Each structure stands twice: as C-alpha cells, then as structure tokens.
Regions:
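Histidine-acidic metal/acid-base catalytic patches
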Residues: 1-4, 9-29, 62, 91, ...
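Active-site-proximal loop/turn and secondary-structure-junction residues that shape catalytic pockets
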Residues: 9-11, 35-37, 74-77, 113-117, ...
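Glycine-rich, proline-tolerant flexible connector loops at the mouths of alpha/beta enzymes
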Residues: 34-58, 119
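Short Asp/Glu-rich motifs
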Residues: 42-43, 80-81, 120-121, 159, ...
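Active-site acidic/histidine proton-transfer and metal-coordination neighborhood
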Residues: 60-64, 78-186, 196-198, 272, ...
C-alpha cells in the first residue's frame, strides 16, 4: 500500500518543486494534489493551457519520485443551489478539474457530492447527484480517470452543530456507488467525517460496509468527534487499530492518503523545520500502513 501526502498547503506555501522535494525527502510514495485553487479565476488550470500546465505539475512530482496518485476537485463554490451558476460555471470547472487531474497522471479524483439543503429531501439530493456524477462520466471515459464519491457532513444553520449530509450514512454511501454502477465511480472514505454526525457506525463500520469492491480511496485524519479538525492520526479519538484492521480485512488496495490540516501541524513553524514535521507525519502513516498489511486478508 502506498503512503500519500496531501499537498494543498505545501504547494501554496512553497510551490510545486520545493513541496515535491520535501515530501520525497520525508519518504512518502506519492501525493494527493488539490485543485481547490480553481475556484479563483486566475488559477492556471482555468486558462487555455490547463492541460499543459497539469502535465507540467505531473512531471515535477514524478521526477521527484512522488507521482500524483489522487487529486481533489474544487468545492468551495458559492451558489451551488443556483441552477444557472451550477450549469454555466461550477460544473464546467469541476469537469475541467477532472481533465487536469488525469493530465497530471492521477488515476482517481475525489469529487464531493452536492449537499443536503434545508428545502430538499435526501431523495431529491440523491437524484441531483446521480445526474451530476453521470454528467461527468463522458469526461472520465475520455480521460481514463475514476471519480471517487466522498462522505460529507454539514452544520445545522440554527443550532450550529454537525448533522447528516450526503453519504454520511453507510447505507446511503453504498447506494450512491451502486446506483452509479460504473467502473469509473468508487468510494473515498473520509475517516474523520464519519464520527461527526451522531450515529452508531464508526469509520471501521463504513470500511466493512463499503467493502473491497466499492472502497478505493481514503482521506486519513483524526478529530475529537466534535469538529472537523483534520489532525494527524492519534491526535484525536479515532481508534486507528480498528480502522487498519478493517482496511486489512477487506483487502483494501487503494492508497493510504492523508488529508491533514497542515496549519495545525506547522502553525508558525519556520520553513527549515518543515522536514521534521513531514517526517513525523510520514512515520505515523508508515506505521499505520504496516498495521493494515498485518491484518490483510486476500479477497477472492
């Protein structure tokens, strides 16, 4: 199993070349490249040469021995519920991000489902998401890349606490992947998101329920079950022995991909200390990969 580091913070701070160098020196196998900057009009991936720019990024990371193995589509758009904005701007940008990820060499890109709203039922959102993802299918086929659906959460606007959202329940998550019914759609389990809405299921329960055939991607991070902290494993309350046991027992074959908030790790740290911080993150991840391998049971 490959150990992958999320790159959004490091690339924004240091640029692609230096970020790739540091992650390679820390011992990671590959990276998850964020395309979040595409919400900004001046992002290079919004320009006419976006494929060439993406290919350049892919070459940089490959040359350092840490290829882009996963990407993340942009999602911090305004006006998701405005059908005109979604049709004319949001969807085309997400589709372009899929093309850019493929040009980098990523075999998979995580694309958030549309969220629940206060005025729509879960079934209505399910139907909208089926159209949304299926509209991406021609792009996936043309580029040879898989889209991973992620489990989400949201906050109650009146009370401020976390509540359920698209794919936040294991049964609904499985339904999404099964209904899409294509080799181009898989599940990305965000381990930290599972425990935020109130429910009995834990992250390892999701692993077992999604199973070997659906689960092909991860977002690895920790929290206190109250806030989406994106901490380093063991900094919160998630039981990592149970997570790794479940991954091994379903014979998970994807990457072990971090989605850590680097501001929480690095903070005001001087750049010369970044290598030490990355080695710390790497060593924990490598230990969790080893635990997963110890538990691995080959699927038939």
């Amino acid at each position: 199993m490959k150990l992958s580091m999320n790159m959004e913070y490091l690339v924004a701070r240091l640029g692609n070349e230096k970020a790739a160098s540091l992650v390679a020196e820390a011992g990671f196998d590959c990276v998850d490249y964020s395309l979040m900057d595409m919400i900004n009009g001046d992002c290079v991936f919004n320009g006419a040469d976006y494929i060439a720019e993406a290919q350049k990024v892919g070459r940089i990371f490959r040359d350092y021995g840490v290829p882009v193995r996963q990407a993340h589509a942009p999602f911090r758009f305004k006006d998701y519920e405005d059908p005109v904005a979604f049709r004319d701007h949001i969807f085309p940008t997400i589709a372009r991000s899929v093309e850019a990820a493929a040009a980098m060499g990523a075999p998979i890109i995580v694309v958030h489902p549309l969220h629940y709203t206060d005025t729509s039922t879960p079934e209505e959102i399910f139907q909208r998401n089926m159209k949304f993802y299926n509209d991406l299918l021609p792009v996936c086929k043309a580029c040879g890349i898989q889209v991973a659906v992620e489990n989400m959460f949201r906050r109650d606007q009146r009370r401020g606490h976390i509540i359920h959202d698209s794919c936040s329940r294991a049964e609904e998550f499985c339904r999404y992947v099964d209904a899409l019914d294509s080799e181009y759609f898989v599940a990305c389990l965000d381990v930290g998101h599972v425990g935020l809405p109130v429910q009995e299921d834990e992250a390892w329960d999701f692993v077992y329920k999604l199973g070997h055939n659906r689960l092909k991607s991860l977002h690895i991070h920790d929290n206190d079950y109250k806030n989406d902290q994106h901490g380093v494993p063991y900094s919160g309350k998630i039981d990592w022995d149970k997570v790794t046991k479940a991954l091994g027992q379903i014979d998970y074959t994807g990457d072990f991909t971090y989605e850590i908030s680097m501001t929480g790790v690095i903070g005001q740290m001087e750049p010369e200390l970044y290598p030490a911080a990355l080695r710390y993150i790497h060593d924990i991840g490598r230990a969790l990969v080893a635990k997963t391998e110890e538990y691995r049971v080959k699927s038939e």
